[in-house]
């Protein structure tokens, strides 16, 4: 029996990057998961898939969604946003909320983040990637539109 391919949509607009080229070993060495990164250019971050928000960092810069089939998806906004301690990021949901792909999760104050010289490279990761097969990321250097373009796919 063939397992249907699961797809994750772009949680933000911007240009895609290969995870291996992200200038932070936590991400480039896949210590927190496998996927890709997007250099954020939009002020809204959406859910890339259906599921439950299973984790929301206190500093608001990252959240995880657990899908119905147990896959953990992490959206990490920027590389050094943790130093902002939540400033410039407004959560629109909280841990435990059921969300659908495309639901707005965070609102970003891009002018403030840019003024503070925050690196907006934003990893989109499958944390428990060893539980999925055929993980495929869109090619690097592609402009993607928030909520429109599929950026990662896998089978369970």
Model-derived regions, located:
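Contiguous, well-folded functional domains in the mature portion of proteins
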Residues: 1-156
């Amino acid at each position: 029996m063939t397992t249907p391919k699961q797809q994750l949509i772009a949680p933000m607009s911007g240009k895609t990057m290969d995870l291996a080229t992200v200038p932070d070993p936590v991400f480039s060495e896949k210590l927190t998961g496998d996927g890709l990164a997007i250099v954020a250019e939009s002020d809204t971050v959406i859910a890339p898939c259906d599921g439950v928000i299973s984790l929301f960092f206190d500093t608001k810069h990252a959240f995880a969604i657990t899908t119905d089939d147990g896959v953990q998806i992490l959206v990490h906004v920027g590389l050094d946003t943790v130093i902002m301690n939540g400033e410039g990021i407004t959560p629109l949901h909280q841990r435990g909320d059921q969300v659908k792909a495309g639901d707005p999760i965070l609102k970003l104050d891009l002018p403030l983040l840019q003024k503070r010289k925050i690196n907006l490279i934003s990893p989109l990761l499958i944390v428990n990637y060893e539980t999925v097969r055929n993980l495929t990321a869109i090619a690097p250097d592609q402009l993607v539109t928030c909520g429109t373009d599929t950026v990662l796919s896998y089978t369970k």
